[in-house]
Amino acid sequence: MTLTSVPAPVSLFPELELPPLPYHRPLLMIGHGTRDEDGRQTFLDFVAQYQALDHSRPVIPCFLELTEPNIQAGVQQCVDQGFEEISALPILLFAARHNKFDVTNELDRSRQAHPQINFFYGRHFGITPAILDLWKARLNQLDSPEANPQGIDRQDTVLLFVGRGSSDPDANGDVYKMARMLWEGSGYQTVETCFIGISHPRLEEGFRRARLYQPKRIIVLPYFLFMGALVKKIFTITEEQRATFPEIEIQSLSEMGIQPELLALVREREIETQLGQVAMNCEACKFRLAFKNQGHGHDHGHGHHHHGHDHGHSHGEWVDTYIEPTAYHEKIWQAP
């Protein structure tokens, strides 16, 4: 069969060696989606770089919402090439509702349309040593004389860790955990955690709390994979804070972007998916608790994906207030 996928450029990381795949199964890399063209293109470039490291199977980009191609189009591309098994990876940082609920719903639709296809659903990135080390290395760069000409000590510096925000408290808790793990032992005065939408405290409140420590420097860490409207919003607010409080050195790191550490992590997740070794802790899942409290069993049994605990959700009478993806997305822009 002919393998078609993202046109792969020359790899930016030819020295990066990935472990071999057990199977030559096509891979859907599923991004969140953004209306921002820069963010969309960066995700496509990320997928292309991953494909460039291994041409043994097609790697196909698609998006959950807000832009094209969507998940159904990605699945159709695999079907058109005659594949009967598909690995699907959510390129998401945390296991919020998109990962637990929305992507799985889309894969259910695909399974109904293509019952001959066997789907294998993988795991989000989560909290990993590779990502922690990446952020530590980026912070180390800000200690250089070029980035820190005033020589401000870490003890006089507050980290401001900015997450996207989620309706799922499990994911929000992971943001706090990541911030804490990054800060402990770093030598910085403290870390404040905030969100750009959905959740509280918001970024402006995060700045206010950071100033209470009377720091000489605040470093903003936007915990995002790729550029997009929300990252640009973080940068805009940071510029406003810099102009309002010129006595404080306010710096901001960029989003993570295309990094070899992330490409290696994708390979880990792809191998997990192929071997059926994906595992998640569902004990604190918001959706499980909602069903349990209303007398429903939490099925955890979407047949289309195989990952350790068979994470899925039986759709009973529980009312999902974010059932429309557009309504969920728009809430992130609403004022408290």
Swiss-Prot record:
EC number assigned by the record:
4.99.1.3
Q: Which GO terms describe its biological process?
A: cobalamin biosynthetic process
* Keyword check for Iron-sulfur: yes
**Pathway, per record:** Cofactor biosynthesis; adenosylcobalamin biosynthesis; cob(II)yrinate a,c-diamide from sirohydrochlorin (anaerobic route): step 1/10
Q: Where is this region: Disordered?
A: 296-316
Pfam families the UniProt entry points to: CbiX
**Annotated cofactor note:** Binds 1 [4Fe-4S] cluster per dimer.
Q: Which UniProt keywords apply?
A: 4Fe-4S, Cobalamin biosynthesis, Cobalt, Iron, Iron-sulfur, Lyase, Metal-binding
Q: Which Gene3D superfamilies match?
A: 3.40.50.1400
The protein in question is named Sirohydrochlorin cobaltochelatase
